Amino acid sequence: MKLDIKNTYSIIKTIEWRPFMRAKLLGIVLTTPIAISSFASTETLSFTPDNINADISLGTLSGKTKERVYLAEEGGRKVSQLDWKFNNAAIIKGAINWDLMPQISIGAAGWTTLGSRGGNMVDQDWMDSSNPGTWTDESRHPDTQLNYANEFDLNIKGWLLNEPNYRLGLMAGYQESRYSFTARGGSYIYSSEEGFRDDIGSFPNGERAIGYKQRFKMPYIGLTGSYRYEDFELGGTFKYSGWVEASDNDEHYDPGKRITYRSKVKDQNYYSVAVNAGYYVTPNAKVYVEGAWNRVTNKKGNTSLYDHNDNTSDYSKNGAGIENYNFITTAGLKYTF
């Protein structure tokens, strides 16, 4: 989307609503803890210090988040895409887990950036329907900041195998994550009504161009496990969700065309793989490194816009796309109390 917004086109997404399938799949998630608890029907709930472990780590966050615009009246073709890229943002990460009984554990985890981090944003438009594969307008914003990013995760695990040197279990949980960006200054190449890529210029340095926020909410299911040999331990977790609810907010700050775009997407897919390796420096303390890859796949959703200058609004379907992927690396300490 151009910063001067030459055209205000109608946008959005129609999500096919399948109540039966959605209820069935969500039911699997909600009943997983009940099924897991059957393994522990004869166990007594005990709260002792030996049942609690916590970890804290420092690391980096890198990735890319994307927003897309589709034109429903032209068959839903993509007419705009903004790519927000970020690298090596410093984060702090923590978790606490409580083994309620040998077969059941509950946990909470989360991470947050320690400050803003420089990034990059590229905004491209494909406005010529007769040549949809060639972009007509582009702006680049190397002065882009990841203002903040964070995530929290609440989960329950049911251990199918739980021995001193190895564990394997099913898990279910709820997770939310947020990202915020601001793009300033930059340069552009636009196409006028009479020409092609014939309008070239730049925006004032430091001037806000676009602000963007994403939020992801999801229940999920997964598989987790670990294996220990002497003082070395390897672990891994896989998580999946088909019920991601994503939303975003795009603020165009051009004084001449001050517009807010808001989009919502439902039932997106989420995949996450995490692997860690650690060494026990004492019987209760382990140092470890971990890598985690996460992805929310693109899907169309509903969009609304509000023009602050003339106080008008619009709403349309099949016009928005939201996507995110990131990679987290951390090193930290885990301690069992």
Where are the predicted features?
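Gram-negative bacterial Sec-dependent N-terminal signal peptides
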Residues: 12, 20-39
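Transmembrane beta-barrel strands of outer-membrane/channel proteins
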Residues: 54-62, 108-114, 170-178, 225, ...
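Repeated loop/turn-to-beta-strand initiation elements of outer-membrane beta-barrel proteins
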Residues: 102-108, 163-168, 231-234, 283-287
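Extracellular/periplasm-exposed beta-strand and loop segments of Gram-negative cell-envelope proteins
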Residues: 64-89, 112-152, 177-216, 241-274, ...
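Outer-membrane beta-barrel biogenesis signature
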Residues: 39-57
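Residues on the lipid-exposed face of transmembrane beta-strands in outer-membrane beta-barrel proteins
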Residues: 94-98, 152-158, 172-174, 221-227, ...
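Short, positively charged and aromatic/hydrophobic N-terminal segments
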Residues: 9-11, 69
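Internal, conserved structured core segments that host functional sites
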Residues: 155-182
